[in-house]
Amino acid sequence: MAQKAPGVITCKAAVVWELGGPVVLEEIRVDPPKASEVRIKMLCASLCHTDVLCTKGFPIPLFPRIPGHEGVGVIESVGKDAKGLKPGDIVMPLYLGECGQCLNCKTGKTNLCHVYPPSFSGLMNDGTSRMSIARTGESIYHFASCSTWTEYAVADCNYVLKINPKISYPHASFLSCGFTTGFGATWRETQVSKGSSVAVFGIGTVGLGVIKGAQLQGASKIIGVDVNQYKAAKGKVFGMTDFINPKDHPDKSVSELVKELTHGLGVDHCFECTGVPSLLNEALEASKIGIGTVVPIGAGGEASVAINSLILFSGRTLKFTAFGGVRTQSDLPVIIDKCLNKEIQLDELLTHEIHLDNIQEAFEILKKPDCVKILIKF
């Protein structure tokens, strides 16, 4: 049980002490929220592949730090300037915000707000941390403006979304990054149209989000590509029409296999969800000449990727994305509503559950072929 001291909460959190080190449970102190901040009691969290990269120093090697950027919680306390939020509200901590007033927000064309962009400094807006090791007082870096693998977290209110409390908390956690990123890429970033063709490289949580988004947008052919045969069944549940396991065709490239299913033309939209650098060129080659669009979504931890410019000269478009282009205040509630009315069903995402006390086990579970999403309980 977390113990409260005046103004400070002592609780448990998962901490990474060094580059490539294990995630260990520590007792930490969580300061009260400052002016525009809220302190959140986490109800559940989940594991995203980016959290694995976090332990390896992505995007900046800051240690010690608390990983986790997916989760849902209830506000415990608020700063004096945290408008629109109050104790008891169910919220998602997020890694980007939406002011609604900056040039980017007013265009309606992007979710990358000038005022509340993604931040990976590991610190709050005033340049300090709200978390420290209880036994030593050493400051702990935040991750992606949130750090959700802790019983209590502090976030700026502009990076928090108050959500409908009727939604399943595990589902809300899955929507706070992975699934929404894939879904949004088809809806907000590329506007997949009715009758179009789509290829999805990597059928994890992000890839399944792409598949469901493409289905709801009316795509007629949705090709899933994965070396894990288990993902074929998962993809079908979310709307995939065709499945390719490259291991079954060692003499052919992925792009060749995709073209075989599209009369030699390739697809209108290809979404690269693995983060494997070499697959980006394959994704480009798998898209149609002149009109094909490729969206890299997977985070692979590579600082740079070599792209065959000759493929781009053939009129294909390469479009990068953050959070699938989904605006946190304007669009994310729409996706939540789709879940509440069963237009989107996320039960099939949840394959494993662990308690925060056993957080290191999650990294081994993630390697299992039947693992899609791991729920972290507190």
From Swiss-Prot:
Keyword field: Cytoplasm, Metal-binding, NAD, Nucleus, Oxidoreductase, Zinc
GO BP: formaldehyde catabolic process
Technological use: Artemisinin and derivatives (e.g. artesunate), are antimalarial drugs due to their endoperoxidase properties; they also display multiple pharmacological actions against inflammation,viral infections, and cell and tumor proliferation. Artesunate may be a promising treatment for COVID-19 mediated by the severe acute respiratory syndrome coronavirus 2 (2019-nCoV) (SARS-CoV-2) because of its anti-inflammatory activity, NF-kappaB (nuclear factor kappa B)-coronavirus effect and chloroquine-like endocytosis inhibition mechanism.
Keyword Membrane: no
EC number per UniProt: 1.1.1.-
GO molecular function, one term: zinc ion binding
Cofactor(s) the protein needs: Zn(2+)
Pathway named in the protein's UniProt entry: Sesquiterpene biosynthesis
Positions with a binding annotation for Zn(2+) 1: C48, H69, C177
InterPro entries from the UniProt entry: ADH-like_C, ADH-like_N, ADH_Zn_CS, GroES-like_sf, NAD(P)-bd_dom_sf, PKS_ER
Binding site for NAD(+): 49-53, 202-207, 226, 231, 274-276, 297-299, 321-323
Reactions it catalyzes: (+)-artemisinic alcohol + NAD(+) = (+)-artemisinic aldehyde + NADH + H(+)
Binding site for Zn(2+) 2: C99, C102, C105, C113
Cofactor note: Binds 2 Zn(2+) ions per subunit.
Any one GO cellular component localisation term in the record: nucleus
Pfam families: ADH_N (PF08240), ADH_zinc_N (PF00107)
Subcellular location: Nucleus; Cytoplasm, Cytosol
Primary site of residence: nucleus
UniProt tissue specificity: Present in non-glandular trichome cells.
Similarity field: Belongs to the zinc-containing alcohol dehydrogenase family. Class-IV subfamily.
Function: Involved in the biosynthesis of the antimalarial endoperoxide artemisinin. Catalyzes the conversion of artemisinic alcohol into artemisinic aldehyde.
Assembly notes: Homodimer.
Record's protein name: Alcohol dehydrogenase 1
Native organism: Artemisia annua
